[in-house]
């Protein structure tokens, strides 16, 4: 039984913000912002990476049902290539907070830096394993992106995206060198860029 984080730590109108998908070679970076309702506990919240896929899927539905407000946002591959991954992630986090139906009094951002926001914000290193609202955001972002990568695997078969979700595994790198990049591969990432830079013999 996974106990998860103490729901008593939930504060009124504090948004947790997290991202998933900074490291993959393809697909969007996905962010989420969540304001939890202190009167509607969600048991078992934790860093999405520490939960089984089945548990994440169940919590995904429960968070969306019980949270005071939530928003899932993204930055597309084109934006990642144009802005760089850090700036694209900050933009996607900004979109998630701005998309909330309730304005938070504070946004707690997983990591060590904050996007430009109209509300006060603070970074929390390893926030997804400390702050329930950030843990909830990590679950929404991960489940959303994982589902999308399964769909993209059907559109671009042969790369194994449903399995590795775009991360640079041996299977992915081998397929990339054999099949070449797809339109959803990030041209600014070295393994993809190097393939495109190879001169034709």
Curated annotation (Swiss-Prot):
It catalyses: Endonucleolytic cleavage to 5'-phosphomonoester. GO terms for cellular component: cytoplasm; ribonuclease H2 complex. CDD domains: RNase_HII_bacteria_HII_like. Manganese or magnesium. Binds 1 divalent metal ion per monomer in the absence of substrate. May bind a second metal ion after substrate binding. It is found in: Cytoplasm. A divalent metal cation binds at residues 18-19, 110. GO terms for molecular function: manganese ion binding; RNA binding; RNA-DNA hybrid ribonuclease activity. It comes from the Bacteria. Keywords: Cytoplasm, Endonuclease, Hydrolase, Manganese, Metal-binding, Nuclease. Its EC number is 3.1.26.4. Belongs to the RNase HII family. This is Ribonuclease HII. It comes from Pseudomonas aeruginosa (strain UCBPP-PA14). The lineage of its organism: Bacteria, Pseudomonadati, Pseudomonadota, Gammaproteobacteria, Pseudomonadales.
